[in-house]
């Protein structure tokens, strides 16, 4: 039991109840006069409710509406509930992609700014893009475009933002855009000429099919700077397969721990196999009562 919240009029309070086993999560309202309880929202799953990573609760006004995060349709999305009638008003976001994080709620304008992953079908589904949508689910606008993962810095009046995006094989690009995502100009593009002169090489991105022969599995390869295509190298896979997140780097860096080991004469590979987080619910559920799997069938495939 946590997140206890009193209504402004003190006529009721709400709390979250995470049932033992993590298959039921409820928000329950309690009448402060007579102690009667009613469920406001209920999440159930035959496997698990990912309450520790995919949780967002935002009360609108005096609590008459609730913005709630859920995987109930198989993907992590936002929903708007009528808390007085104790029912869903409408999905705020929907589609075969996930909401990663809510960044800002404009209560008067009834809009939400949030981070999305997988919203561009032809890009790596782990890349973060930034979006805006109305609370009634209309007007979805993707504010970022570049084929990479994005970070935003807003102007104080939120009329403009600087979009910094990169990939492991693409040095950072900084763009100036307006609040609706319209491109204004490129501010700066990182110059790595001096870095390349040291012999440093970009990692290589790759995609392979998973154990089912259908699901795309995304990974990165690091080779020694003196790599010789004629030679044969031992391959080491860098593995941390905890189901609470994903681990393959997505943004550009000039230093990777994997590269340090590659310099000893190895090829390093890292993937995020089935059972890791931030894809579909089905993808994540592979870990259910199956932690020992650790994505190994997908690793064997590549």
Predicted regions and their residues:
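Serine-hydrolase catalytic core recognition
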Residues: 10, 16, 144, 149-302
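Beta-rich, blade/repeat-based domains predominating
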Residues: 4-5, 57, 152-156
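Multi-bladed beta-propeller domains
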Residues: 1, 30-55, 81-106, 118-122, ...
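Glycine/Thr-rich phosphate-binding loops of Rossmann-like dinucleotide-binding domains
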Residues: 23, 76, 122, 171-172, ...
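Beta-strand C-termini and the immediately following turn/loop, strongest in propeller blades
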Residues: 6-8, 14-21, 28-31, 56-73, ...
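A short loop-to-beta-strand structural motif that recurs across blades of beta-propeller domains
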Residues: 26-28, 77-79, 129-131, 173-175
